[in-house]
Amino acid sequence: MRLSGSVYSKILDMDTGLTIVTPNKLREGKYKVVYLLHGLCGNDRSWLDYSMLPAYAAKGDTVYVMPDAGRSFYSNMKYGFDYQGYVTEELPVICRNMFNISAAREDTGIMGCSMGGYGALRCALTHPDSYGFVGAFSSGPLFARAGMEEIKKYGDLPDYAERFGLRLIKDFKAIYGDALELTDDAEILDMLVKVKAENKLPRIYLTCGRDDAFMKEHELFTGALDKMGIPYE
């Protein structure tokens, strides 16, 4: 079954897009759940429109929940909306009130592509008691601190702004403020160190296409995980 429409969020204080795909058959027990996060230019329908998700979900035991988070990088924005709070705190309650979804950590995953991959990691690591699995595909930015320092240094140069994307620079300033001061949860490697020390690491799946623009960043990131002794697939 596919459901696509909008839901009112108290945290966002507005209606926001929401798409849900469920298995075709009812089951006696609770369903597992995966929150699927879209990329920078996508929306809640992206996974429905550009993947075979309904076919995969039809015979399974998992409900797939796809929120709309704009260009927020799934953060609580300095100038904007608290999308991380919505996705990690309010949305699961909304979905459990509509469907027979398990609240157990081992039955809950979060996944995403590009901006959504970064968002999945960020959400899973800021709420490690909520997610037993995180999947990140062609994710960016995996090194947020370095990215913001580069924008601080070169962002006012016309050639850099044109190459990097003026719209994206504005996005990051909306998220972190004009000074681009990162919040504590923005740097994924730092969060991994913290969650590992708490012995709360979720299962981690990482992948990236060989010709993807994020491939170099992906290789640097997985290399860092190897050195840190953090397991992933």
Model-derived regions: residue spans:
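Non-catalytic cap/lid and distal C-terminal segments of serine-dependent acyl enzymes
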Residues: 1-233
